From Swiss-Prot:
Family classification: Belongs to the PlsX family.
GO molecular function annotations of the record: phosphate:acyl-[acyl carrier protein] acyltransferase activity
Enzyme nomenclature, EC number: 2.3.1.274
Subunit structure: Homodimer. Probably interacts with PlsY.
Catalysed reactions listed for this entry: a fatty acyl-[ACP] + phosphate = an acyl phosphate + holo-[ACP]
UniProt name for this protein: Phosphate acyltransferase
Source species of the chain: Coxiella burnetii (strain Dugway 5J108-111)
Gene giving rise to this polypeptide: plsX
Protein localization: Cytoplasm
GO biological process: fatty acid biosynthetic process; phospholipid biosynthetic process
Entry GO CC: cytoplasm
Pathway of action: Lipid metabolism; phospholipid metabolism
Group of enzyme by EC: transferase
Role this protein plays: Catalyzes the reversible formation of acyl-phosphate (acyl-PO(4)) from acyl-[acyl-carrier-protein] (acyl-ACP). This enzyme utilizes acyl-ACP as fatty acyl donor, but not acyl-CoA.
Amino acid sequence: MLKTIALDAMGGDHGPKVIVPAALSILKKHPKVKLILVGKEDQLALLIPEKNRKSFGQRLEIIHASEEVGMDEPPSQALRTKKNSSMRVAINLVKEGQAHACVSAGNTGALMATARYVLKTLPGIDRPAIIAAFPTKNEREVRVLDLGANVDSTPENLYQFAVMGSILSSAAHNIRNPRIGLLNVGEEEIKGNELVKKANELFETRKTINYIGYVEGNTIFNNIADVVVCDGFVGNAVLKASEGVAQLIKQHAKEAFSEAWWTKLALLPAIPILKRLIRRVDPERYNGATFLGLNGIVVKSHGSANIKAFVCAVEEAIFQVDKNIPQLIKEEVAHILKEFENK
């Protein structure tokens, strides 16, 4: 059976100019995937060569949506007035069972508000969270959540995030009990604000996750945890700082290779090492954050994503469809709730 992904083709800073070529790249690479491009049909059709229309056949479909959500548009306004936006129609396709997942590079707040309104949260989950993968000092990734969906969270919210993150990490890396860390300003028990301290007590009391204790910001990337949990305010700061550092490394590397010819000659032996380093920290490679905890799969691409980065976001959606992540979360949460009821 084909895995069908709906793409908000008008979303992001570059819209169809990035999303259509990325879609064609995905279809070439993944023969068992169907993509639905949602947006202004006349604009989208112009960007698809006739040879691709013929070769991909029914695996490539366009569904017209007359409106688009602006990157600075208030979420409440988009939800209330843009009922025929490419974003809303793409999410509706997931709700109606015509698509297994939705990917958008559009306005994050509007996407979260619309996805939550249309799809609703899974039973036992109070709030969805944004989760994404980050590189570590070895080839294994660490997944961090919440990256900005909830500025204010409760200890119970953080616990639910931990459960969901554990399930996703387990599926992604084929590990039985992913290590869960709670982000804090220190490893000592006395450190942290009230939210973190109470969440720590809750994590230790409930033995349903492999909780390893506090993780500091400077050890997120040291492969001591598979999942790091925090509230959305802190998580978004971690995300933006990490992206900034990665871009700084890339920029310095490019500047080094734009120096005089003798500098380039001296750097020649280091080129393979630098390329590996740049590849490992490249934000494009890790593009694709998931709105975890919804009755459906919604993946958020960075608004400024290029073709390569948007492809990565779509591949994250394909992976989650393969593993049926929402169903795994639903089953695990139901199992945990049943355990608590029996105690």
